[in-house]
From Swiss-Prot:
InterPro entries: QueC, Rossmann-like_a/b/a_fold. It comes from Mesorhizobium japonicum (strain LMG 29417 / CECT 9101 / MAFF 303099) (Mesorhizobium loti (strain MAFF 303099)). Catalyzes the ATP-dependent conversion of 7-carboxy-7-deazaguanine (CDG) to 7-cyano-7-deazaguanine (preQ(0)). The gene is queC1. Belongs to the QueC family. This is 7-cyano-7-deazaguanine synthase 1. Pfam families: QueC. It catalyses: 7-carboxy-7-deazaguanine + NH4(+) + ATP = 7-cyano-7-deazaguanine + ADP + phosphate + H2O + H(+).
Length: 232
């Protein structure tokens, strides 16, 4: 399977890139600049592509992103602190983001004669993001089968769609993913904040996987409070 991986530079997509490079044929990484405040993640995608010796392309869709207003990831809206599964995290939804990126990726994959587009959506995303759920993945595959009928037969490869973040950490370790060379924090500062939903989820995932977290957090202990508050 010749696969094009959508890679943000985050833990999930970098782990997926290493998985595909080991198990299949990785033909390249595709990233998107949609005006996200944590744009520094794109640099980690570039590092991953260089490490795996594959082409890396960043697609500029900032004009599109400017029209998807109201999200804490793109607008002047505070990124909330707390657990990823809290209702407050819905402010991080960028409407139709994955659908837009996947549609572009399928077009690129078809032009490059690839067999698959790989995406790292996972089970932990289901609560907040509708375009990360299994039903969406299945529906998008059906739509692309019609969109490319007679031209290309491309599979949407989403191996993590029913896996937890901890599962991805465990599998990423198996494929020697350099977790320190990935970026998760939505606030986009010099260091991982340790308080936003993605930082809390990241720290919790390493703990559940029983693997040492190499990440440098500004607040390394907040995740415990976030988990306790959610469980209360």
């Amino acid at each position: 399977m010749n696969a094009l991986v959508i890679c943000s530079g985050g833990l999930d997509s970098v782990s997926l890139a290493h998985k595909v490079a080991t198990e299949q044929k990785l033909i390249g990484l595709l990233s998107f600049d949609y005006g996200q405040r944590h744009k520094k993640e794109l640099g980690f995608a570039a590092i991953c592509a260089k490490r795996l010796a594959v082409p890396h392309q960043i697609v500029d869709i900032r004009d599109v992103g400017r029209n998807l207003s109201g999200s804490a990831l793109t607008d002047n809206v505070d990124v909330p602190d707390g657990h990823y599964a809290e209702d407050s995290m819905r402010i991080t939804v960028v409407p139709n983001r994955n659908a837009i990126m996947l549609a572009i990726a399928f077009g690129v994959a078809a032009a490059k004669k690839a067999d698959a587009v790989a995406t790292a959506v996972h089970g932990g995303d289901h609560f907040i993001y509708p375009d990360c759920r299994p039903a969406f993945i299945d529906a998008f595959q059906t739509m692309q089968n019609h969109a490319l009928a007679g031209y290309a037969d491309i599979r949407l490869y989403a191996p993590y769609v029913n896996m937890s973040k901890a599962d991805i950490v465990s599998e990423g370790a198996k494929y020697a993913t350099p977790f320190e060379a990935t970026w998760s924090c939505y606030k986009g500062g010099a260091r991982h904040c340790g308080r936003c939903g993605t930082c809390v989820e990241r720290r919790e995932a390493f703990d559940l996987a029983g693997i040492t977290d190499p990440t440098d957090y500004e607040d390394a202990d907040f995740w415990l409070h976030a988990i306790q508050t959610r469980s209360a």
